[in-house]
């Protein structure tokens, strides 16, 4: 089922839109920004105001996406420069494809992975992980599959610097 997006902004939109001159991908995302339904899945009490000011995603397809399906989920996500995404996990398996910027992925049982554009990181179901963005922040395509598609990630510990 198709669901017409209802435009919903996030505090980071002006930052994303200002990146339009950095390349075609940024320009395309900046053009979509005012028409997309941006989502944040945490509260200020959970992650702090700084995190919320520098984070958000668009669900392309999935239980709450533009294209509604229970088979899988796809997001385009933005995490700002130097942002730390605290330890969290979710039942669904997850793959990140870094589109722009850099991110240090640290996951339980895996060696740390510092990835740039084209880098891919897989997280198993229930695997706790953190992310630390590089100096440019990160745009990524994030894919979920398996059980727990409609659930949000849950934090395992309070953020280090909220």
What residue ranges belong to the model's regions?
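A short beta-loop-beta micro-motif enriched in histidine and acidic residues
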Residues: 66-73, 81-95
């Amino acid at each position: 089922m198709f669901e017409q997006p209802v435009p919903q902004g996030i505090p980071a939109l002006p930052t994303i839109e200002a990146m339009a001159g950095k390349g075609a991908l940024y320009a395309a995302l900046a053009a979509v920004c005012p028409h997309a339904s941006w989502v944040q899945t945490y509260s200020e009490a959970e992650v702090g105001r700084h995190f919320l000011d520098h984070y958000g995603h668009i669900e392309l397809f999935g239980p709450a996406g533009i294209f509604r399906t229970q088979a899988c989920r796809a997001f385009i996500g933005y995490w700002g420069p130097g942002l730390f995404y605290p330890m969290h996990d979710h039942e669904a398996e997850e793959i990140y494809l870094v589109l722009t910027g850099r991110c240090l992925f640290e996951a339980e049982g895996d060696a740390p992975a510092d990835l740039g554009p084209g880098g891919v990181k897989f997280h198993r179901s229930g695997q706790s992980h953190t992310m630390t963005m590089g100096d440019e922040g990160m745009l990524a395509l994030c894919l979920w599959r398996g059980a727990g598609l409609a659930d949000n990630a849950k934090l395992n510990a309070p953020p280090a610097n909220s």
